[in-house]
Amino acid sequence: MEPTSKKLTGRLMLAVGGAVLGSLQFGYNTGVINAPQKVIEEFYNQTWMQRYGEPIPPATLTTLWSLSVAIFSVGGMIGSFSVGLFVNRFGRRNSMLMMNLLAFVSAVLMGFSKLGKSFEMLILGRFIIGVYCGLTTGFVPMYVGEVSPTELRGALGTLHQLGIVVGILIAQVFGLDSIMGNQELWPLLLSVIFIPALLQCILLPFCPESPRFLLINRNEENRAKSVLKKLRGTADVTRDLQEMKEESRQMMREKKVTILELFRSAAYRQPILIAVVLQLSQQLSGINAVFYYSTSIFEKAGVQQPVYATIGSGIVNTAFTVVSLFVVERAGRRTLHLIGLAGMAGCAVLMTIALALLEQLPWMSYLSIVAIFGFVAFFEVGPGPIPWFIVAELFSQGPRPAAIAVAGFSNWTSNFIVGMCFQYVEQLCGPYVFIIFTVLLVLFFIFTYFKVPETKGRTFDEIASGFRQGGASQSDKTPEELFHPLGADSQV
């Protein structure tokens, strides 16, 4: 039975692969706005000239560009907070399928913005694709976590982050001036998102609905059993069904969990706090400052070909996500998150030193590249992939949609703050801007060390019962004490 449960079947690969196309969309739309900044700003200037007969004021251009970057996160905040409205009503798979309509609308708006001489169309398109991506960051980890066997849940959950970083890398390559990041083709660069949306529309109808949703939410045991047999590649799915039934019985003893209930109930208070702080540790680590403004950071560091250095960081990004994929089930979530936070803090200090001494020591530009590459690598070891799927692991079926909505909203809100404020904070702090992120990284390390339990190898119900047993006094317990009933290996 044990070896069978670990099997990576064709149907499971199809289900996860179809879902993470949404993750790729998220990554692509995060990274695509970076490289063509100058040509899009020129489009804004030309449009302004045609309307008002004068060049666009520099302050207005900065505001419009910051809005073009940050409006994506506003859409993401709205989308992430709406996850529960869809997944409980339409199911996990059907929700992902329906949301592709937003991607098609966004592609049309951004693709025809130049023809329509309207920067408003581009900004609206960025907002709509942001809503799509906000929903996706809830749908994909939830679906992947629910279709995956316990032994593969961490590795397959990391594929969400792998989809994101591959999307960022594709955006960086497509954004090269010699490919699509030029005066003529930038509308195509922004609208090419219709291709993964179309591909997902073709694949998802062949993917199964989440068996947990079918059994626990819809009480369709026969369908859930049939889906499990296909996903596991075996006729014996007794253990999975038994675990889901136990979780279903536990849900029936609980009243319906709303977002407010997550914060009122002692059983949910600690896991929701952990979920939110882990999401903040991802976004407030400074990683999106690197993603959004990497080209300009490399320019300031004196790098001759900054766009290629940016692509180099994208390759490092992807490579270390693959590393995380293979070690997450061995090393554990908590350990990797701690290593990632500590490494990023060290690289942020190096980056600060390199930028501060650049004028006196030109060779410091090379140190800045090493520091940024190291920063990105350590991010993908832990803070990149782990917050996405650990939220789904911390909660049982009942509170999971509400918890993912709260965690996603926290992620996108902090994403918005970084995207909107980094340019201004950088102007204020100069080369010392990454000291702010260093302090935050140290604080997140301390929180993770004292509060975050290990979830590796545990069923959803085992993890949730660990918090329930803590009850009202759980805030006084260490992760080891809180999860002691789950076995001696609760910490890695």
Swiss-Prot record:
GO MF terms held by the record: D-glucose transmembrane transporter activity; dehydroascorbic acid transmembrane transporter activity; fucose transmembrane transporter activity; identical protein binding; long-chain fatty acid transmembrane transporter activity
Q: Which residues are glycosylated?
A: 45
Q: Which residues carry this modification: Phosphothreonine?
A: 478
Side Extracellular, residues: 34-66, 113-120, 177-185, 294-306, 356-365, 423-429
Residues bearing N-acetylmethionine? 1
Catalytic activity entry:
D-glucose(out) = D-glucose(in)
Q: Report the InterPro entries cross-referenced here.
A: Glu_transpt_1, GLUT, MFS_dom, MFS_sugar_transport-like, MFS_trans_sf, Sugar/inositol_transpt, Sugar_transporter_CS
Q: Which NCBIfam families match?
A: SP
Q: Which family does it belong to?
A: Belongs to the major facilitator superfamily. Sugar transporter (TC 2.A.1.1) family. Glucose transporter subfamily.
Describe the task this protein carries out. Facilitative glucose transporter, which is responsible for constitutive or basal glucose uptake. Has a very broad substrate specificity; can transport a wide range of aldoses including both pentoses and hexoses. Most important energy carrier of the brain: present at the blood-brain barrier and assures the energy-independent, facilitative transport of glucose into the brain. In association with BSG and NXNL1, promotes retinal cone survival by increasing glucose uptake into photoreceptors. Required for mesendoderm differentiation.
Its recorded name reads Solute carrier family 2, facilitated glucose transporter member 1
Instruction: Please give the organism.
Output: Ovis aries
The gene designation is SLC2A1
